[in-house]
Structure formats: structure tokens, C-alpha cells
């Protein structure tokens, strides 16, 4: 019983045979026996090839059609070429689709008048109907219900679809017409909105007023009061106002009003839009500003009842295909010039649709229209002003009068805090320097009229603050220090403001990377932002810096990519680690604080080499100062005791940071050389390469030697430096107070226990003098 029964391996296997599949070969034979469909050129289902709007080297090659899945049948002799379906391709798929009979006979039936035959047919049909009625009198009652059901069941679906569309249009009409009264304001009784009585003189719609109430915008700013009425009246406007004065709403509200007017007109006229044409195109110089504009306008739209306007954001770093799909249904297009031009140039029919926009908004116009910066802006403007003549647009013949729109129907809105070209002149240098009036209206108008094609000969120039473009609540200061001790004075300034959200500006990407690592080594919450970062990383840094749940002492180290238009609430302090190169850069940098009537501080850390540029800066920005100040930039004196106490911290952090950066640089260079040697099939020896590189005396030799020495720091040495720095950071900066006898000095013990005041210092610290 314990033994298993063994199978006879030989007997059964000799007689078992695999079943042959006979069905498939017969089907193949039948399939092969079927005659192949051979057709001519005109019988194929040709598909037109979609071409982009802007072509470079096609040279008039249009009307291209293609077909896939066909083989060429070459006839004997010189006959006409024939085609058949490729193997594995159904024959019907390559044939042209037959037109329905209804379409064929729709235009073939013509009325030829009355004839005697038609009258005889009608008389015969009437007699047959009378006989049928007499025969079915008794069974009429029993079939009425059934006939009604059949009629209802056989109702065409087209009528149901039309009814649904009609009901939807009526519902939409009710939603918009209901917004014509102030009933929309009563629907949100539970939400404590702001008092918007100050907005009523501007003549805005109830939907817009509801949105402003929800967003807590109780009072319009001076630029909004001055710009909104002429924009609503259809004028071209050039608006100049200080940073943080609400320029986004100054052009966003008229765009929303035009959208509401267009929707009301469509419902009254019962018009169906054949093709979606955007209302406005808004251009901005940076991606962060474009994202911010989209966020503000979307908030304005989403809080307005019955408004379903769509926005499309076109910036670099994101998918082009997705942005093209968003552009198909967009009402408002916001983007940077490079990506907007790329999407328009590679799309089909997008330039023609964009020519129908009603508003062209150029935010931060002095930056977008500056010489040699944004060539795509000129391409966009020329394409919007071009008339289609039935052929491809000729890029070389831009000056021809035949291709330019004679009368532009769109409004052009231009906004910035600085328009004068003199502000874009470099402050440092030996070139000719011109001071004077920075708000020369005549030169600004001539400069803009040369660049833009306005609808009016003289657009309205609205200057809200002609004397100074700096915010009223902004305090400006300067800290003088040696060139090699900027890190020390930067850290000291940050210790003076521990709970202030600070923005540090530099002039280079390498400085952003180094300062960010330095501050992080000093255990400060620092974030980086520059143009070489990936788009998602840039958005992540801005989101973390502006988050309400973030550390109130968060520091953002950025290049001038964050200088324009970035509206982040709670920025109290702006530090210029490097003196700005131009005066308009200083204006926009300092404008990140003291926004919307709030107060803020702006400090320049100035070395002796930068003093000439800072003096010119003060002369340009504060040329027409009328407040009676002798010095527009106050000189700040830091406590020398604090500077000497924290010097060792900064020295240790700088050694650690420089070592890490040098090691990363050496590793990156070594990996690049190793990969290049592998591609060339050459053996790579790092020691031999370094020895060969040391023979020369080229430029940068000293820097390379210094990087090699700094990068040679061992891990044990770095660990010792980190431990020493950690010990120093765990202690407060002692300003001459005995730690054993705290009550003997000027120390507020109760404030220390409650953790009030500046926790970085132990002792009395006088605040900065501004």
C-alpha cells in the first residue's frame, strides 16, 4: 500500500497523438482564394496631413495627403498604377467611405411643378384610406394605446437631443439673467463678505462685485480707480504704478466684464460659437509671475456666480501637448513669450484664432520690450497683426503693408512700475551715465509706440505716482562691509530679524546655491530659486516659502527671476546680497515687500567696490524725492559685539559649504571625463590627467588649485567641523551677560521664560535704526 503505482510510460504514449487543427488552414485557404481588391488612386481613403501655421523651409509645399496599409500593384507595360491592401490590413479600410444616400439625394431632388399623375396618385390614396378607415372602425379603440406607445418609441433621438440642448440653454440663460440682479449677493448670506460699496462707482456687474466681496477686496486702489473706467470704455491704456498697488485686478476686472457681456449677448441672440476664440492674451516675463497671474484671475472667476471662463497657462517646463489641448477651450491665455510662441508656431490654426482676441495685456512691459531680451514678443506681435492672404505667412517680408492689419480691433493694455529706459542702464561701469527725470512721460510714450501697435494714436497714459515709484511704507537702508565678509553681515542681519519672512537677492546662480547651503548649515530654513532649477522645483520652493503653515522665519535666496510681479504675503524683509545692476531691478526687488499698503524693509549689503553704483542708484530712483530727506538710503550700523561673536560660526559654516561644493564639482567633472573616455574607447587615468592639466598656466588655474585643496578635506575633519559648529549654534549669542548670575545684568528673565523677543541673543539688543 505504501508504494505508489507507476504509470506505464511506453504503452499509452505510443498510441496518443496530438489532434490536428484543420479549421485554420481551411480558413487560410479560403482567405487566400478570395480575390484581392485592386483599386485606383481616386478610390483610396486619403487623409490630409496637418501642417503647422508657421513653416520654415517648406517653400509652398501644401495640400499633402497620405494613406497607410497599401501595396502598389505594377501593371504590365506602361499602365496606370493600382493599389491593394497590405497583408493583415482589411480591404475596406483603404477604400473611400461611400456617401450616405440622404446626402446624395439631398440636393438632387428639385421641384418640377404639379402634374396630372400626382393628382391621380393623391385621389387613389385618399380612396384607399377611406376603405381602410371603414374596415378598422371596430378595432380602433383597442389599438390606440399600442399605436401611441409605438409612436413614442419611434421618436427620433435627434429631437430628444435638441430638447436637452434647449433645456440646457434655458438653464444657462436663467443662471446669467439671475446674475443681472443683486440676488446673487444674497445667495452667499452665510459668507461674511467684505463691504464693496466703494466699487459701485466703477460700474461693475453684480457677478464681479460678488467675487470681490468673497475675496475681501473692499476698496479699489488708486491704479484700479484710474485704469478700469477707460478700459471699460474701450481705450488703450498704459498704466504705471508702484509695486504692490493692484495692477493685476486693474486689467483682470475689465476682461471678466467683457466675458460676461459676451455670454449675455450669446444667450439673447441664441448664437452657437462655431470656434472657440480667446478673449485675452496676457504676457509676463517669468514663469512664477505667469503662475501668479493665473492664480489671481482664476480666483476672481471661481468666486463669481455663473461664470465658467477657462484659463490656459503656457509656461516652460510643462508638457506642450497638454497646453495645446488647454488652448483649444481657453477664454483667457496667460504665459511667457517663449512658450506662447512655441505653441502658436507649432499648432494648426492657433495664430488665426489668437488674432481674434479683444485684449492684449503686457505685464512688466519694460522688461518684455527691452532690447535683446525677448525676441519671441516681436514674433507674437507681428503674427497677431498679420492678415492671411490665402498662402503661408512670409517671415522675411514683415514690412509689407499687405500683411499688416489696417485697423486693430483689440485693446492693448501695458502695465509696469518702471518705463523709463534710463533705469535699464547699468549702474556700474565707465560708460556715459545720464541722470535726471526718471518719469519722463514723453520718452516713455515714444518708446512704447515704437514697439506696440495700439488701436488709438495716443493711448491713455495713467501715472498714479509720478514723483516716486517706491511704495510708501518701504524703508530703505544700506550696510557697508568688506567684500569678503558679506556672509558674516548677512547672517547678522538675519539674526536681527528671526521671525521675519526674508527674501535675499543675488546676481548669480552660483551665489544662490552657495548661500543656500551656507544658511542651511547654520540651521536656518533657507530655500533656493533660480532659472536653472526644474519647473517643479521652482514651484515647490515658492509654495513652501509662501505657505501659511511654514516657519515665519523662512528665507528665500533667489536671483532676479523672483524680482518682478511675485506677490507673496508676509514678506517683511528684502536683502540685496549683491547691489542690483540697474535701477529698475532695485525698484522691482524692493517691491516684493511693503505691498498693498503694508510696511517693509529693504537693505543693500554694499562693499567698497559697489559704492559708485549704489550712489548712482539713489540718484536715479530718488531724483524727484519730495519728502525732504537728505539721504534716501539710511546707513545702518550693526552691533560690533554681535558681529565678532558670530564670526566663528560663519567661518566654520563656510568651510563646510565650500568643501561640499568643491567635492560635488570634482565628482561631476571626473564623471564627465570618465564617460567621455568610455565613449571614445580610451582608458581614463585621473592621476595622469591631473598631472597633464597642471602643466599649463591658463585662466582659472588658481581657482582649480583652491578647489582641489578645499575638496581634499576628509570626512573626519568635516565631522569635527560640524560638531564644533553644532556646539556654537546650541548657545545664544552672549552680549556680555553672566550666565551664572542672570539677575545681575540687564536680562528680562520673564521674557526668557515666555520665549518672547529675540531668542538668538542673551542680553539687551538695540533694534536697527530704521
Curated annotation (Swiss-Prot):
Basic and acidic residues: compositionally biased ranges: 1-10, 138-154, 162-174
Name of protein: ATP-dependent RNA helicase mak5
PANTHER family, sorted: RNA HELICASE (PTHR24031)
Gene3D superfamilies registered for this protein in UniProt: P-loop containing nucleotide triphosphate hydrolases
GO molecular function annotation: ATP binding; ATP hydrolysis activity; RNA binding; RNA helicase activity
GO cellular component, one term: nucleolus
Family named by the database record: Belongs to the DEAD box helicase family. DDX24/MAK5 subfamily.
Originating organism: Emericella nidulans (strain FGSC A4 / ATCC 38163 / CBS 112.46 / NRRL 194 / M139) (Aspergillus nidulans)
Listed Pfam families: DEAD, Helicase_C
Extent of motif Q motif: 197-225
Localization of this protein: Nucleus, Nucleolus
CDD domains: SF2_C_DEAD
Entry text on domains: The Q motif is unique to and characteristic of the DEAD box family of RNA helicases and controls ATP binding and hydrolysis.
Domain Helicase C-terminal positions: 489-639
Gene that produces this protein: mak5
Reactions catalysed according to its record: ATP + H2O = ADP + phosphate + H(+)
Chief place where the protein resides: nucleus
Coiled coil: none
Binding site for ATP: 241-248
GO biological process: rRNA processing
EC annotation from Swiss-Prot or TrEMBL: 3.6.4.13
Biased composition (Acidic residues): 105-118, 391-401
Motif (DEAD box): 363-366
Task of the protein: ATP-binding RNA helicase involved in the biogenesis of 60S ribosomal subunits and is required for the normal formation of 25S and 5.8S rRNAs.
Region (Disordered) location: 1-33, 78-174, 384-404, 693-713
Ranges where the Helicase ATP-binding domain occurs: 228-437
Keywords from the UniProt entry: ATP-binding, Helicase, Hydrolase, Nucleotide-binding, Nucleus, Ribosome biogenesis, RNA-binding, rRNA processing
Amino acid at each position: 500500500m505504501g508504494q505508489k503505482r507507476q504509470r506505464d510510460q511506453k504503452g499509452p504514449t505510443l498510441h496518443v497523438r496530438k489532434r490536428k487543427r484543420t479549421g485554420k488552414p481551411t480558413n487560410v485557404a479560403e482567405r487566400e482564394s478570395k480575390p484581392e481588391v485592386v483599386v485606383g488612386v481616386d478610390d483610396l481613403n486619403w487623409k490630409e496631413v496637418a501642417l503647422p501655421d508657421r513653416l520654415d523651409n517648406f517653400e509652398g509645399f501644401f495640400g499633402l495627403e497620405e494613406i497607410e496599409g497599401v501595396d502598389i500593384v505594377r501593371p504590365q507595360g506602361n499602365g496606370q498604377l493600382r493599389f491593394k491592401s497590405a497583408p493583415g490590413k482589411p480591404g475596406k479600410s483603404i477604400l473611400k467611405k461611400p456617401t450616405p444616400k440622404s446626402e446624395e439625394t439631398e440636393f438632387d431632388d428639385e421641384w418640377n411643378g404639379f402634374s396630372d399623375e400626382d393628382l391621380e396618385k393623391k385621389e387613389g390614396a385618399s380612396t384607399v384610406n377611406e376603405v381602410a378607415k371603414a374596415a378598422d372602425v371596430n378595432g380602433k379603440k383597442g389599438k390606440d394605446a399600442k399605436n401611441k406607445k409605438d409612436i413614442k418609441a419611434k421618436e427620433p433621438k435627434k429631437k430628444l437631443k435638441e430638447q436637452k440642448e434647449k433645456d440646457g440653454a434655458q438653464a444657462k440663460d436663467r443662471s446669467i439673467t439671475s446674475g443681472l440682479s443683486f440676488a446673487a449677493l444674497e445667495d452667499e448670506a452665510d459668507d461674511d463678505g467684505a463691504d464693496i460699496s466703494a466699487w459701485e462707482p466703477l460700474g461693475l456687474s453684480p457677478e464681479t462685485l460678488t467675487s470681490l466681496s468673497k475675496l475681501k477686496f473692499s476698496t479699489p486702489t488708486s491704479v484700479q480707480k484710474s485704469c478700469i473706467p477707460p478700459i471699460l470704455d474701450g481705450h488703450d491704456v498704459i498704466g504705471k504704478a508702484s509695486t504692490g498697488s493692484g495692477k493685476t485686478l486693474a486689467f483682470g476686472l475689465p476682461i471678466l466684464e467683457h466675458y460676461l457681456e459676451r455670454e449675455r449677448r450669446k444667450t439673447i441672440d441664441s448664437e452657437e460659437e462655431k470656434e472657440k476664440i480667446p478673449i485675452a492674451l496676457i504676457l509676463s516675463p517669468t514663469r512664477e509671475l505667469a503662475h501668479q497671474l493665473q492664480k489671481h484671475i482664476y480666483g476672481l472667476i471661481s468666486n463669481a456666480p455663473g461664470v465658467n471662463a477657462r484659463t490656459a497657462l503656457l509656461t516652460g517646463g510643462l508638457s506642450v501637448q497638454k497646453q495645446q489641448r488647454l488652448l483649444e477651450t481657453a477664454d483667457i491665455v496667460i504665459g511667457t513669450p517663449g512658450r506662447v510662441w512655441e505653441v502658436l508656431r507649432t499648432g494648426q490654426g492657433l495664430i488665426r484664432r489668437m488674432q481674434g482676441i479683444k485684449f492684449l495685456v503686457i505685464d512688466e512691459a519694460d522688461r518684455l520690450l527691452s532690447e535683446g531680451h525677448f525676441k519671441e514678443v516681436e514674433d507674437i506681435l507681428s503674427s497677431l497683426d498679420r492678415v492671411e492672404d490665402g498662402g503661408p505667412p512670409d517671415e522675411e517680408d514683415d514690412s509689407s503693408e499687405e500683411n499688416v492689419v489696417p485697423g486693430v480691433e483689440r485693446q492693448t493694455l501695458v502695465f509696469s512700475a518702471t518705463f523709463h529706459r534710463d533705469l535699464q542702464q547699468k549702474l556700474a561701469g565707465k560708460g556715459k551715465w545720464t541722470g535726471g527725470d526718471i518719469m519722463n512721460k514723453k520718452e516713455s510714450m515714444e518708446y512704447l509706440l515704437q514697439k506696440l501697435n495700439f488701436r488709438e494714436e495716443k493711448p491713455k497714459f495713467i501715472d498714479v505716482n509720478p514723483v516716486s515709484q517706491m511704495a510708501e511704507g518701504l524703508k530703505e537702508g544700506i550696510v557697508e562691509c568688506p567684500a569678503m565678509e558679506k556672509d558674516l553681515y548677512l547672517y547678522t542681519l538675519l539674526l536681527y530679524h528671526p521671525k521675519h519672512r526674508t527674501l535675499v537677492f543675488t546676481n548669480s546662480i552660483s551665489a544662490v546655491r552657495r548661500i543656500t547651503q551656507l544658511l542651511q548649515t547654520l540651521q536656518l530654513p533657507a530655500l533656493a530659486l533660480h532659472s536653472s532649477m526644474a519647473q517643479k522645483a521652482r514651484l515647490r520652493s515658492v509654495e513652501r516659502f509662501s505657505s501659511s503653515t511654514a516657519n515665519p522665519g523662512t528665507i528665500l535666496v533667489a536671483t532676479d527671476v523672483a524680482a518682478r510681479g511675485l506677490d507673496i504675503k508676509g514678506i517683511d524683509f528684502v536683502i540685496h546680497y549683491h547691489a542690483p545692476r540697474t535701477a529698475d531691478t532695485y525698484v522691482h526687488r524692493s517691491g516684493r515687500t511693503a505691498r498693498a499698503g503694508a510696511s517693509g524693509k529693504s537693505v543693500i549689503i554694499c562693499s567698497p567696490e559697489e559704492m559708485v553704483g549704489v550712489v548712482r542708484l539713489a540718484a536715479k530712483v530718488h531724483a524727484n524725492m519730495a519728502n525732504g530727506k537728505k539721504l534716501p538710503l539710511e546707513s545702518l550700523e550693526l552691533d560690533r559685539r554681535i558681529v565678532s561673536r558670530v564670526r566663528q560660526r560663519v567661518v566654520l559654516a563656510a568651510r563646510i559649504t565650500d568643501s561640499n561644493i568643491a567635492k560635488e564639482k570634482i565628482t561631476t567633472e571626473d564623471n564627465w571625463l570618465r564617460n567621455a573616455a568610455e565613449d571614445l574607447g580610451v582608458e581614463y587615468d585621473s592621476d595622469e590627467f591631473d598631472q597633464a592639466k597642471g602643466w599649463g598656466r591658463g585662466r582659472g588655474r588658481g581657482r582649480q588649485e583652491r578647489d582641489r585643496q578645499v575638496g581634499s578635506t576628509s570626512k573626519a575633519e568635516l565631522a569635527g567641523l560640524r560638531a564644533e559648529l553644532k556646539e556654537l549654534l546650541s548657545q545664544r549669542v552672549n552680549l556680555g551677560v553672566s550666565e551664572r548670575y542672570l539677575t545681575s545684568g540687564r536680562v528680562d528673565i520673564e521674557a526668557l521664560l515666555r520665549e518672547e523677543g529675540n531668542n538668538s541673543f542673551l542680553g539687551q539688543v538695540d533694534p536697527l535704526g530704521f
